[in-house]
Amino acid sequence: MWEIIDTPEFQRLRNLFQLGNAHYVFPGATHTRFEHSIGVAYLSNRLTHHLIKSSKESKSFNFFDINSESNVRCLTLAGLLHDLGHGPFSHLFDRKVIKTLK
């Protein structure tokens, strides 16, 4: 995972506010997409481990192959990388510009 975090593409997230210009109205809204992505990766990892533990304790609930550490890595990486490909203006770009281009 460190190999991905250390790339220039991921490091550029340090310069992007997660909430755009909201920090002008809400002074505490200053976290970056980098910080957000690290946090989402952490939560993805914790959630996955919780689901694995629940699967082991319940005969009726089987989320996925309990013994697969690659599943944990994949879901953690999905959390880490979920914001990496956003265009300018983030979700506004996703909703408006991409829709217009279709």
Q: How should each PLM-predicted stretch be described?
A:
Residues M1-K102:
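Metal-dependent phosphohydrolase cores
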